[in-house]
């Protein structure tokens, strides 16, 4: 059975829900044993009020937060996470490494910047944003290195 991860863009939408119902969102068990919510909130094109919107999304029950360095809002997303008051371990944070960062040292710098900007010790899922030919294996190996370090 295929499961589709639905990213809900709640910005500007009138969504009425309660956190108790949102906590019933089904999860997908990943190969490493982690549970990933099937419903999350995306932060693409969210700039000025990203912290407020992320905080609100978490307070109404969203637990998967999707962002990327290329969105230019990881600091604000991290601020929203902190403001929510929800324990980090209850959240599933996804970010992305830009194609332009797909080289040894720059991958590490990119990941370290994301960790710092998000204000977290670890990221649950890191994707390669628009992977292109070349450096994919090297980038993948560095991502595995960060997993082994618990980051």
Model-assigned labels for residue ranges:
Residues 4-15:
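Sec-dependent N-terminal signal peptides
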Residues 20-91, 142:
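N-terminal binding-site loop/beta-alpha segment at the start of enzyme catalytic domains
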Residues 44-46, 68-70, 96-100, 128-131:
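Active-site beta-loop-alpha junctions enriched in small/polar residues
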Residues 89-93, 123-126:
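Residue-level recognition of the N-termini of beta-strands and the immediately preceding loop/turn
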Residues 102-151:
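Glycine/proline-rich, positively charged
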């Amino acid at each position: 059975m295929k499961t589709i991860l639905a990213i809900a863009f709640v910005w500007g939408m009138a969504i009425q829900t309660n956190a108790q119902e949102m906590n019933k969102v089904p999860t997908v068990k990943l190969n490493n044993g982690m549970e990933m919510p099937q419903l999350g909130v995306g932060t693409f094109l969210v700039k000025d009020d990203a912290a407020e919107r992320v905080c609100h999304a978490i307070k109404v029950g969203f637990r998967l937060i999707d962002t990327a360095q290329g969105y230019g809002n990881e600091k604000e997303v991290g601020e929203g996470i902190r403001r929510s008051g929800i324990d980090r371990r209850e959240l599933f944070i996804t970010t992305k490494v830009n194609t332009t960062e797909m080289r040894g040292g720059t991958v590490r710098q990119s990941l370290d910047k994301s960790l710092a900007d998000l204000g977290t010790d670890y990221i649950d899922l890191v994707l390669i944003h628009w992977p292109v030919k070349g450096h994919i294996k090297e980038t993948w190996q560095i991502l595995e290195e960060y997993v082994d370090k618990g980051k």
